[in-house]
From Swiss-Prot:
Residues 483-487 are annotated as: G2. Residues 458-465 are annotated as: G1. It comes from Anaeromyxobacter dehalogenans (strain 2CP-C). This is Translation initiation factor IF-2. PANTHER family: TR-TYPE G DOMAIN-CONTAINING PROTEIN, TRANSLATION INITIATION FACTOR IF-2-RELATED. GO terms for cellular component: cytosol. Residues 558-561 are annotated as: G4. It is found in: Cytoplasm. Residues 57-254, 304-328 are annotated as: Disordered.
Amino acid sequence: MSKKRVHELGKQLKEQGIELSNQELVEKLHALGYLEVKSHSSSLEDDQAHAAYEKILAERKPKPAPARPSGPGFVVRKRAHVEPPTVTAPAAPPSPEPEYAEPQYAEPQAEQAYEPEPQAAQPEAGAEPAAAPEPPAEAAPLAAQAAPSPGAEAAAPAAPQAQPAQPAAPAAPPAPTAQPSAPPPAAAQPRPPQPSAPSRPPPPGYRPAPPPGARPPVSAAPGAPGQPGAAGQPPRPPVDPRTLRPTSTQAVVISRPLVPVRRVTPPTSARQQFPVAPGPRALGEVRELKVVPGSLGREREFIDVSRDKRRGRQPGRPISEEQAKSLSGKELLQAAISDRAYIPIRGKKKKPTKKGAKTQITEKAEHKKVIRIEESISVSELSQVMGVKASDLIRKLMQMGKMVTINAQIDADTAATLALEHGYTVEKKGFEVEEFIPEVEVDESKLVIRPPVVTVMGHVDHGKTSLLDAIRQADVAAGEAGGITQHIGAYSVNTPQGPITFLDTPGHEAFTAMRQRGAQVTDLVVLVVAADDGVMPQTVESIKAAKAAGVTILVAINKVDKPQAAPERVMQQLTEYELVAEQWGGTTIMLPVSARTKQGIPELLEYIALQSEVLELKANPDKLAAGRVIEAKLEKGRGPVATVLVEEGTLRVGDALVTGVHFGRVRAMMNERGEQVDNVGPGYPVEVLGLSGVPVAGDEFDVVEDEKAAKEVAQHRATKQRQKELGGVKKATLEDLFAKAKTSAQKVLNLVVKADVQGSSEAVSQALEKAATKKVGVKILESAVGAITKSDVLTAAAGNAVIVGFNTKPETEIENIASQQGVKILMFGIIYEAVDRIREEMAGLLEPIIKEKPLGKAEVRQVFNIPRVGQIAGSAVTEGVVKRAGHVRVVRDRKVVFTGKIGSLKRVKDDVREVAQGFECGIGVDGFSDVKQGDVLEVYELEEIRQSLD
């Protein structure tokens, strides 16, 4: 159902003559029960608006507006008394004549009550008679004054009868503005009105009218000529009006309104006759006047339009060019003034002033009171949408037990609670990722066998990379720092059983996330356990990660060629973690292998192929590619480089790719041997170039239709991630306040971590954060991939941080900038070396413990005052040794009166560093000159002891 605004309702009422201001209309609607209306822009349903319109119209019935005039203005005529001409005619019986009532000029209804003259019966083409409005209530007294005699009232009903035409009269066309003539005497027949043009020559027998003083008086008594009571009297002789002279002109304006000007003159074709009371006077010259505005627009003037009528120009219409040529300048001016008769005259509109101006109360529409958010919204954004001060929202949140700032993110439920108090509702809007990344149904006919993905996991130094080197017939382990793997590597190996994709994961405890990612994307897990070392912590962690991912575990007991190898002991230890060998009746395959002698490697590959057949690994290569990011890094000259594993579809160069908050178009792809490839099928790893940033290892990637769709998905994920990071608002508890106060007193080491790959950056950051203790904390200001840049140095300088570089080095220029800024750069290639060095930096932040170490005592025997030197205490060393660099306490009567440092130490006249027990010396105390005989000087030194982190 449609709606109507309040100001539209006001316009509709104004058309009916009811003028209400916006505020008055709002108050009126409130009085009628429409309390939801707040201002002129508020909306009402159509049925409500119609009901309110009818109620207001019923309460304030406007007076009927007078009819719109069809003519140019009022018509005011002048009348002259004429004597009927003497006409010799044969005697004839008098015929009944119509009776006339007194004319009522102000009554539009009088026009409707009488028939027009015969010559006006044929109107002009296209002219329509104007409908007369209803007579106003005040017309009755006027009619009573116009017809005071009872006879006139009795003659009124006979007025509507039509006047008979006079056949003997000449057929002269009447003027366009000819008006109804007065009724003839009782003995005369009605005649058509005479034209008022004075230019015609007088007929023969013309004689001037007698002067006004010689005219007999008109009697108003009943029975006098022209009165209703004279119906039975003999008629007076007719008088030719052309023989009479017109009297003085008298203009009468009947019921002229002020503004707007209303004209009641009907068109010429529809003009009606107005009967007048019979009397001795007849119509003479007729002048037509029109009411027009004055020259200044503040008054009214009467303009004679009779001459315009005689010249064939209709009043109130603009003159043509031909007519303008025949008029003088004065006549043109008068015509221009007369054309302004229809211009409404209004007073000057007053400019609105600020003083006294009422404030319009506006309110948003209901459909605008809906706030749509996704996961969260900031306090500032919510305040702007609702038009509420942010401080009020923060105060309300504090009352709810939530400590927030103006830029803090609040969840949708909290926002809904705040919005409900201000009349708003909150709706969660979702971003449908399925619109860009649709799910494709599996078509069994298009599935093909893909290579198995095998992840090699285990403890550090148990030979995982060496085992892969033996399978690939390569030597990757020799090139790794410290002989340990610190990156996750992906290799595709062609074996007699078919292609197999291997993922090599680090075994160090810091690379837990890498091992978990490897377990998530794999089909099989080869758990490598050293036969001489047994099950270790990272071995147990790898077992848990594989079981959590729900993948099959195949155990390879490595280093069986060593003399101290004990495979049986390893198998026994694995049973504690529900891994029972097939030889012992279990379901887990356990093979003894040796990476050095390549013992058991063919059997391992055969078991991998057998397990892949059991799992029925298939994929559809015809669909859009999808998979996971295994590793990512930032290389100079190449930009962001991501190592991805294609799980479904085929990845091609030029595809639009989106992963996490990054997107791009595949510019190039390279396999593990550095060879460029154009497409990669499911089950194979590849390096991808062309992303907008370094993605997070472990994120999924998808190929979409175009780069625009990829950008939209990435931007949505970035916004959602930011809202999630800022949206964590927790209730403030007393425990949190105590913990915060305790943390504020804790020393914190700020770090900026830069690594060669994203996985190493993540692992190093986690390892360094775990090194924090109760005394010293570790805060990672920034963790990124790539070389150390000037921006990293400036960030570290601003945060008083140390830069940790892992497998990356800064340029010489960057080292100079760091030296100028006082920033320390530490570079490492092995992760445990980085952890040990950072612990030393953390210990350096702790203030050392000051410990007092006694040296000796001396007794003052004599005091010497030496000019320009000061007071010297001649003392004898009674205990230990007195050193010149030591501290001293002056003890008098077992009370310490001063604590300071020894300023000078002499023996006889020589300065000495120390004086042993049993010798005398002179001791000068800095800042103290009140040494007395008998005082004891206790000498000691302060020793700093470095605190431990534990």
